[in-house]
Amino acid sequence: MTKSNGEEARLGGRMERFQQGVRKRTLLAKKKVQNITKEDVKSYLFRNAFVLLTVTAVIVGTILGFTLRPYRMSYREVKYFSFPGELLMRMLQMLVLPLIISSLVTGMAALDSKASGKMGMRAVVYYMTTTIIAVVIGIIIVIIIHPGKGTKENMHREGKIVQVTAADAFLDLIRNMFPPNLVEACFKQFKTNYEKRSFKVPIQPNETLVGAVINNVSEAMETLTRITEELVPVPGSVNGVNALGLVVFSMCFGFVIGNMKEQGQALREFFDSLNEAIMRLVAVIMWYAPLGILFLIAGKIVEMEDMGVIGGQLAMYTVTVIVGLLIHAVIVLPLLYFLVTRKNPWVFIGGLLQALITALGTSSSSATLPITFKCLEENNGVDKRVTRFVLPVGATINMDGTALYEALAAIFIAQVNNFELNFGQIITISITATAASIGAAGIPQAGLVTMVIVLTSVGLPTDDITLIIAVDWFLDRLRTTTNVLGDSLGAGIVEHLSRHELKNRDVEMGNSVIEENEMKKPYQLISQESEIEKSMDSETKM
């Protein structure tokens, strides 16, 4: 009895303390609300002006788009209407190339080989971990919900798919990592094309003769060899920045400059100044971003031919992708950030709000890169050496949303075709989806191109990608937002894990600057004295 009474007393005391704490917090909140002045409201609005304007732009753009849909605007009218949004995309894409090069060069040059190696390893481990988790989530969700019930005969098809083999796509990825011409890499990527070529294939006579029907064997063989054709790979190219090649070159170049010490100081200062100038241009463009996002979203809604597709045949598929992306973006990534850093992930994500909304509007992680830099460095205070290293690489190869989408879409197409996948084929899909997402450049709808590789790996019809193109414009924006969130949280995690190396580097740089300043003075005095002595000697000789 005494024990139970003691436990009840302790529980009662805890409840009372909890209630007192709640009452105190409530009173403090009331006091804060009562003490809010116009100046406080103005300062809050000024601090969060970008975010508030961007959120307002998304809401107004959505309403405006649905309001204008009944007017059935022509293609030309839609393009004119979307022109302010097109300007935003062009301005952001204009800054991507110099930003990737300058940020990676300065980021690598600011770190020693040991620190950059550790940071790079942590970033790669994070990228691979989150991508594999995303693929697993996509596979589990699509198997549980099973959105591919029914038949594909009544489903709407849209667009055409370019055929590509997995081997050629992988080789193209490796080739693009090492561009032969850096200038060309700024506007072109290598891509294998296919041509039909005729070949003379030797055929044994016993394979073509059937009794006495064919009298002239040589003539029959000649006829057969003329129609024998094969698709052969030939070198080609497509327009677009070869981001992967520029990332590899910039990392190597920055690493070399960092090891050159004093000799590389001029180059370090040049790229540092270039990076700072680009970020100042970004600050100017950010004021225009809300207007551009408004017209991008409104224009895309007006441009859609049939809104019923999302709510009709592909409704369950769309819901499945959204659920998978939400689980990864709202649960997995914040939880991973909290487990590593022991910090509130939602405060960190709050500082990224404008970058996430820009990703939603532009559907391009590369175009969002300038805004992501601004949000991480200014709002969340992430070390510039980390953002300059992690973000450009992440925007190029870390695509969690794309990997999740490709694995999920491949299994959806298998379900639509009543194709039963075994465990080995599901593993194959997960591996190829992970690899294909690395090869997907940060450009709109790149996932559709790389998904051909995933479908080919398990023998699924690649033409069935046309079944899901109708909703890809919408899902592309969601997975791009997930990609940007993954890159940004990765920068926060890598900074936390690399804090000791960064501090040690700061100490080393401080000591080296002091030593350099001390060494310069006596050197200048000696050189001046030696010049005076030389001139005196020459005068006496004269």
UniProtKB/Swiss-Prot annotation:
Protein's cellular compartments: Cell membrane
InterPro entries: DAACS, Na-dicarboxylate_symporter, Na-dicarboxylate_symporter_CS, Na:dicarbo_symporter_sf
This protein's encoding gene: SLC1A3
Membrane topology note: Multi-pass membrane protein
Binding site for L-aspartate: 363-365, 402, 443-447, 476, 483
Keyword Phosphoprotein set for record: yes
Lineage of producing organism: Eukaryota, Metazoa, Chordata, Craniata, Vertebrata
GO MF term list: glutamate binding; glutamate:sodium symporter activity; high-affinity L-glutamate transmembrane transporter activity; L-glutamate transmembrane transporter activity; metal ion binding; neutral L-amino acid transmembrane transporter activity
This protein's name: Excitatory amino acid transporter 1
